[in-house]
Amino acid sequence: MSSEEDDAISLISVLGLAVFIGLCILLVVLIATSALILVIYVIIDCILRPFLGTCLDLDLEIGVQRGQQRARIVTYHTIISTGLRLPDFEREGKKRGLKQSVIETLLPKLLVGQGNHEEDEEKSLESRECAICLSGYVVNEECRVFPVCRHIYHALCIDAWLKNHLTCPTCRKDLPES
């Protein structure tokens, strides 16, 4: 081999090594950037989102205040009122539920925020939302308190529930037999 050939091979080797090192550096930068983006996403999603959501009283998924979520509730009540139900083959032959007159007797309606039921008011302040429809309570809204466990629900929600079940939706305690 001549010295020109050695120089050409040496130049090609150096250029190949430089390209290889450049690609390795680019790959490391790409991996580090991806890791940084992932860390930022986790911080925002797991740490800041719940904090900002409760402090600003915003639902970050749809960008509205919680009091403006009536569309979801109307849809839920529409589904209940139309009677759409999935078949329950275990109870097909035996009807377990209460008539509206029995529900009215066992669980009288109460208005939220009236102060005439202090213990119930404390429960509603603890939960701040109906466990059935997941909507918050509004002042002067009709609610019912489950007599056994004192859980509070919207009247329409618990009425629909009690027409098919004889237990509390939250803790599954049975209604008193009377």
Swiss-Prot record:
The pathway noted for it is: Protein modification; protein ubiquitination
What Pfam families does the database record attribute to this sequence?
A: zf-RING_2
Q: Name one GO cellular component term.
A: membrane
Its domain of life? Eukaryota
Which reactions are catalysed by this chain? Answer: S-ubiquitinyl-[E2 ubiquitin-conjugating enzyme]-L-cysteine + [acceptor protein]-L-lysine = [E2 ubiquitin-conjugating enzyme]-L-cysteine + N(6)-ubiquitinyl-[acceptor protein]-L-lysine
Q: Write down the top EC class of this protein.
A: transferase
Statement: the UniProt record of this protein carries the keyword Metal-binding: yes
Biological process (GO) annotations held by this record are: protein ubiquitination
Task: Write one Gene Ontology MF term.
Answer: zinc ion binding
Q: What are the record keywords, sorted? A: Membrane, Metal-binding, Transferase, Transmembrane, Transmembrane helix, Ubl conjugation pathway, Zinc, Zinc-finger
Q: Which residues cross the membrane?
A: 11-31
Positions of the zinc fingers (RING-type)? 130-172
For this UniProt entry, which residues form the secretion signal? Answer: none
Q: What is its subcellular localisation?
A: Membrane
Question: Which EC number applies?
Answer: 2.3.2.27
- Chief localization class? membrane
List the membrane topology term(s).
Single-pass membrane protein
Family statement:
Belongs to the RING-type zinc finger family. ATL subfamily.
What is the UniProt domain comment for this protein?
The RING-type zinc finger domain mediates binding to an E2 ubiquitin-conjugating enzyme.
- The name under which this protein is listed is Putative RING-H2 finger protein ATL19
Name of the encoding gene: ATL19
